[in-house]
Amino acid sequence: MDIKRIILYVIVALLAIALFNAWQRDYPPTPKPTPTVEQPTANGDHPTAYTPPAFTPGAAEKTKKAGTIALTSKVSEARLITVRTDVLDVEIDTQGGNIVSAKLPKYPVSLEEKQTPVQILSGEPNELYVAQSGLTNGNGQPTTVQFESEKKQYVLENGQNQLIVQLTGRAPDGLLVTKTYTFHRDDYAIHLAYQVKNNTSKPWQGSLYTQITRRQPPTEHHHFYVRSYNGASMGSPQTPYEKLSYESLDKQNIDRTSQSGWIAMQQHYFLSAWVPGNPELTYHYYSHVIPASDEPNVYVVGFVSPQMNVAAGSEAATHATLYVGPEIAKRLKGLAPGLERTIDYGWLWPISMLLFWILSAVHAVFKNWGWSIIITTILIKIVFYWFSAKSFRSMARMREMQPRIQALKERHGDDRQALSRATMELYRKEKINPLGGCLPMLIQVPVFIAFYYVIIESVQLRQAPFIFWIHDLSVKDPYYILPIIMGLSMLAQQWLSPTSPDPTQQKMMWILPVIFTVFFINFPAGLVLYWITNNVVQTLQQWYVNKTYESHKAKLKARRARKRKR
């Protein structure tokens, strides 16, 4: 086996380890919550509660804590309004008009539980995750409104493309408030509109706030290479995508202003996000942490709109958009710039997006993500064939030099400096780059990493079947057949390479496929399928290059001879 290939395999392994270390830095282990002493309220209750935002008046509208809303028990069924569309099952609490539950009927929890949809938002206290919105008064205090609705259940019927849920209520200061949610068919974006009618004799000042309140979820026990980001994030024209891990929010609250933008909570494949209604206005983004003694902390992230001024007898309106659903680029990109970056393709995001576009185009034809991975991999190998052929020919030339290098070793004995000078002189004379076999292959490594992220992070591959026993390309092969095939493909690839006279390299020839088989045994089936295809195509390319090497060398000699004659 050629030493260059050993180096390449080691580099790939080291890159995988580097990915793990980078992930550890981005998503460190969950810190234990700091114990806090809870003070009883006036009625003696101990509030395991979060604090909605309160905003001081003025341009900056800094956030501060004020008031509490207890979350010691589940929201009463009597206060809930249910909304069902073709893609969302939502529950709205009439106290405040907040969305306290959101399920995705088109995305089952697992193939074994097809009737149980993924639930993103939840009002359960131990897994609190709700999308809130409301109004503040002129003093920056949140106003809680008890809303009413014409119906308790809303359903998007067949042939209906839009569903409107209107809530009405009166604020303590006398304002008539109408809160309207608009749902659309095949859409995870929910449009929120607030209409304020000032029936009092005094002018009213206030703002719209929207926020996501979430108790830190338990750490998922994944193998390191399928660990995805779980936490908050935000975007702005200055920084299209910024991760806000729970650890960073523990250290420092968000307190900044930005024109347009967005704020979100992410998990693997899914997210919830608030997007301001008017991209030309400047909003204040904030966060705060509610410590808990016996449970994980609660994290609040959101934004508040510029202040509205409503004269007596007048009315005003403001709006925002809530997205609760899968991380699908074309849906997210249309809502806000940078929101599609929540598909965590890592530092090679542009390459990953290009690869996913190609993968999707192939899938549009073949309707199977497994075959799409295979065909896309073949296309990639065709594009990089020039680099691969150059690498194979360089390794072939190095093998041709082995007898002459061995002769140099015998001539110079233990004089390493003389041997090094003689070897480099030989390379210079024969116009050989000793790294020529590695560098063309290394150019392809970023593509491998980018494709890795595509397979790991693309929700389209979640629970996507291939053939026979592969029912989900996003999880490991349950029978470990693909990793074994991958190991055999590595052996076949190495079999084409002439055996090295070095006994150590001969041992490595047999050890490396075993190591990589074990290394890949828990990889998602889609990623192993890509690696198998890559190995098979590369083996065929190497076979072809080896077969045509002598004729290629003869052509080069003839070309050089013609140049010398000129």
UniProtKB/Swiss-Prot annotation:
One of its GO terms (biological process) is protein transport. It comes from Coxiella burnetii (strain CbuG_Q212). HAMAP family: YidC_type1. It holds the Pfam family 60KD_IMP. The keyword Chloroplast does not apply. InterPro entries: Membr_insert_YidC, Membr_insert_YidC_N, YidC/ALB3/OXA1/COX18, YidC/Oxa/ALB_C, YidC_ALB_C, YidC_periplasmic_sf. One of its GO terms (molecular function) is membrane insertase activity. This is Membrane protein insertase YidC. Keywords: Cell inner membrane, Cell membrane, Chaperone, Membrane, Protein transport, Transmembrane, Transmembrane helix, Transport. One of its GO terms (cellular component) is plasma membrane. It comes from the Bacteria. Belongs to the OXA1/ALB3/YidC family. Type 1 subfamily. The keyword Transmembrane helix applies. Interacts with the Sec translocase complex via SecD. Specifically interacts with transmembrane segments of nascent integral membrane proteins during membrane integration.
